[in-house]
Amino acid sequence: GRPARAQVLVDASDPIIAASALSNTQGIAYAQSLPILYGRLRPETSYEVSTLPVDLEVRGWYNPDLVTSFYIVPGLIGVLLTMTMMMITSMAIVKERERGTLEQLLTTPIQPMELMIGKMVPYAAVGFMQVTIALVVGIMIFKIPIRGSLLALYGMSFFFIVCYLSLGLLISTLTRTQQQAMQLSFFIFLPTILLSGFMFPRAGMPLPAQILGLLMPLTYFMEVLRGILLKGVSITLLWRWIIPMIGLMFLFMALSVIRFRKQTD
């Protein structure tokens, strides 16, 4: 006559999916309990039921209170880096081309690769400053937990920053004016926000949208950020997200170098 007890553990790092999973789990428990309760009832007796036959204990991991900011704020770090690194790099190079200063730099003994690295280093420093400021604001205002290694977080941020700096350089080789560079940057940025899992869970997207999302570095960086900050996951368990992100970084670097050398030649 004692209730059957069961425990359900839910990954609550995404509060939207976790809330849906908790609701569905409770619904299953009630659906299993009702036939048993009806079978116990007798016409000549009436009593109050204090405990369901299926006693379900649900526990949410990583974000038990389902705080939405714990999920949103880490993603904002990636969104901020995506927008700024890609846009400021592409527009800065195009601006120098419009002014004619880029051609003056190319007449010096500096190699095109050295020029590209020189352009990327200051913006990479800006990117690390943005990560630091976002972390400080997230901790002080939104009480975001940091359960993993900050060193690993900054290391993965380096690859992500270089990835979008390279994409910004590639955009600068495909455009002639600052307006064109800004428009192309926004053309890439908006689908990235929608398909990376920042606004909507990727599991609920159509298959073509999920495939397109895999072509965007932000998709992988989102998982890395939330894995390190919310779950305390080590790098060894994040390789399925890290390797594609690094692969896209090298792809964008190679394409930007090829295009840049063609233009300088």
Residue spans for each PLM region:
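Transport-system extracytoplasmic interface segments
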Residues: G1-T84
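Hydrophobic alpha-helical transmembrane segments of multi-pass membrane transport proteins
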Residues: R59-M140, C163
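Membrane-interfacial helix-loop-helix junctions in multi-pass membrane proteins
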Residues: Y62-L66, P145, G197-L251, R261
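Hydrophobic transmembrane alpha-helices
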Residues: L76-M83, A124, S157-V162, L184-S196, ...
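Transmembrane alpha-helix boundary and packing residues in multipass membrane permease domains
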Residues: M87-M91, L135, I139, L169, ...
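Short helix-capping/hinge motifs at transmembrane helix termini and TM-loop junctions
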Residues: S90, V94-K95, T108, I141-I146, ...
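Alpha-helical transmembrane segments and their short interhelical loops
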Residues: P112-S185, L190, I235-I242, I246, ...
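Short cytosolic juxtamembrane segments of multi-pass membrane proteins
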Residues: I258-D265
